[in-house]
Amino acid sequence: MALPTHAPLGSLRSQMQLTLHTHHAIRLWHGRLPSGHLHGILGLNGFVAQVNRIHRDAAQDDPYADAWLLRIEAKLDTARAELLDLRAQLSDALTQAPAALQLGDNLNLAPVQLPVTVNAPLGFLALYLLADYDELARRALLAQHTALIDPPTLERWLEDGAHVLRSLFSLVQTYRTSGVCRNDIAAGNAKALHAREQFGELPQPILDGSQRARHAPPLRRPGPNGQGNAAPVPNATEVLDKATTEPVPPCTP
């Protein structure tokens, strides 16, 4: 039986969960709610929610959201490098065990399995870093248990790794949606002026779309029928070649 060429299809979905073995990693997942004189600490869960929001805003052609994705991407690269350095130090310590002693995986008998809902690639990259930290914590606890490192070294490595992730997660706490798109900026309308007053000026490569994060989403721009369509950002030369004196259309119909 022949299938119709344009058979209706639903959205693709997959079920994902993250398995954590240490309290150190679980605390970084949840973060901390503000209480009394203690300020709140954003965990991975809150970080992912903010990154999903920024990713969605960037897809709507918001140049300020694109600037945030670049900042987050740079911070992720730095965090990854710092965790790799800690992992290298730990690996050196574990090699001090005699060849006759086989050290197996240090796994929790009842690990925590957390459902994962991530809609942005940068959220996944942060999740991978938390999984790496969980492994680092497990192996460091094993190294201390087998006298390959002392307790102060264990605490220092655990805290250094946790600080790297907390610094990453806290980066997005101040994000606010600007409510503008590149057409607003080009038109110099009231929305653009308000955004500039609140969030400042942006570098030209971000404004013209030539500088975007590696995992930036395709842009959705209003089509002739008022519906958002994915469209590449033109480069600066194309913009100059097609310049006209017509008014720039707004972002939304």
Language-model-derived ranges and their functions:
Residues 139-140, 157:
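Short, hydrophobic/aromatic alpha-helical segments in well-folded domains
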Residues 152-153:
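Short, solvent-exposed positions on alpha-helices
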Residues 1-128, 135, 142, 161-253:
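Polar/charged low-complexity regulatory segments
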Residues 148-149:
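Conserved hydrophobic residue
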